[in-house]
Amino acid sequence: MSSYGGGYQRDSYRSRGGQGGYSNGNSYGNGGGGGGGYGGGGYGGGGFGGGGYGRGGGAAGGDRMSNLGAGLKKQEWDLETLPKFEKSFYKEHPDVTARSQREVDEFRQEHKMTVQGKNVPRPVETFDEAGFPQYVLSEVKSQGFERPTAIQSQGWPMALSGRDVVGIAETGSGKTLTYCLPAIVHINAQPLLAPGDGPIVLVLAPTRELAVQIQTEITKFGKSSRIRNTCVYGGVPKGPQIRDLSRGVEVCIATPGRLIDMLEAGRTNLRRVTYLVLDEADRMLDMGFEPQIRKIISQIRPDRQTCMWSATWPKEVRQLASDFLNDYIQVNIGSMDLSANHRITQIVEVVSDFEKRDKMIKHLEKIMEDRSNKILIFTGTKRIADEITRFLRQDGWPALSIHGDKQQQERDWVLNEFKAGKSPIMVATDVASRGIDVRDITHVLNYDYPNNSEDYIHRIGRTGRAGAKGTAITFFTTDNSKQARDLVTILTEAKQQIDPRLAEMVRYGGGGGHGHGGYGRWGGRGGGRGRGGGSTASNAAPLGNNRRW
């Protein structure tokens, strides 16, 4: 405990560079709830307002990809003249030191943990062994956690040591806290922000939803040391984000596109960043953010500490780590091969497009017998997400949809309704396949099979989180047959039953090609658009008289 000394806790609101306090409470959560009120009538009655919403826009909101970062000035770093900073805080607990190497090896083996790199610290088995200062420890214990997850056991000593870190772990493994708590310790060891300073900690995330989830954790655990944060992402007005940045925040959680917008406009800078986190690095690369990530990192001093977190370890992620991390240490939880969470029961049904709707209803009838269940339904396109939602609502099911064309306030409202169980059926595209942190999702249904096995793993990983069990149901058509072999490999590794027709596709080599997933059922590309008047209309469709739940 004393290894951090007593001086890291920020005193009171000590002006943080003259900015003063929490600035009307806005520093937390400008990314979240948007303020509007949808309960009193917007949805279900007259729709989501007569105009404005449903204009289309584009999935990424402010995160346009074209020529982002062209206006950023190239930074020349002279390490001799840069201010020094602290990043090594870890002191091994006597109980950890006392364990034999055999005990350490057995612990790692039991938790399917492998480590790589020089002088990797030993894992800790309790929160006290991590050696966090009391102000961090009390926040953790107040949340009722019993013991660290596997990634936390090994990741905390690694991150607190000041080394560059790579962590590979399944979704729902507790990785957010693995970098958040060391970030809080790191901030409290640095000089206070001066006017004009940018953040000390930068967290890059692929989606708005994940960014808001991270902000919630940072806010919760940074409260006692009065650490301010903001969430910077596209699809919402820039004004509140600009205000937060100008007042000064120690932590900035951002999607790459909107952050570059802010940097190019001179709204913030990254000169003070000494702790950089790349969360879901594989997903950011999948989404085409690599050029933006490279431009952002070029604005950060090279002797920073960098932590990279990913669910998979493909060659593109390995290359990024090689380019931007120095002498890094790595922890992998689980197999390095693509694998699914073994607490999830996977049911794959080979169907035709025309069977999907009826089969979905049969599953819903069974699942919703238990009113505490929550189901997340994934579709291949935004159009199908809206059409299914409209169909389900008209059939009496309390369904809402979320995807990239919906404005941020609507997305926040839908997520809150789903979390609260008021609308226990949520239909989503892959914009929601990561970053949605709803811990009690009991079922996932893949109405359309995703484009690749990685997305399949991440979709079904929305259930079975935090030690719970879950069920994933997947509709697989002949159009998906080129992916049959990969899917069978995943099912076999997780010891799941395999539909004989799926095995047959593998045996005969498939050959369906890339079809349109679920379009057939809905009568072609034009069908259904006119009824609703924009993407929002699906959530405004009145519930049918035949209430199914």
Swiss-Prot record:
Span of domain Helicase C-terminal: 359-506
Broad class of enzyme this protein falls into: hydrolase
Domain Helicase ATP-binding: 156-331
Chain sites annotated for binding ATP: A169, E170, T171, G172, S173, G174, K175, T176
Gene3D superfamilies: P-loop containing nucleotide triphosphate hydrolases
Chemical reaction(s) catalysed: ATP + H2O = ADP + phosphate + H(+)
Residue ranges annotated as motif DEAD box: 279-282
Keyword annotations: ATP-binding, Cytoplasm, Helicase, Hydrolase, Nonsense-mediated mRNA decay, Nucleotide-binding, Nucleus, Ribosome biogenesis, RNA-binding, rRNA processing
Chief location bin: cytoplasm
UniProt xrefs under SUPFAM superfamilies: P-loop containing nucleoside triphosphate hydrolases
Known partners and oligomeric status: Associates with polysomes.
PANTHER family xref list: ATP-DEPENDENT RNA HELICASE DBP3
Primary role: ATP-dependent RNA helicase involved nonsense-mediated mRNA decay and ribosome biogenesis through rRNA processing.
Name of the molecule in the record: ATP-dependent RNA helicase dbp2
Species assigned in the record: Aspergillus clavatus (strain ATCC 1007 / CBS 513.65 / DSM 816 / NCTC 3887 / NRRL 1 / QM 1276 / 107)
Gene symbol of the encoding locus: dbp2
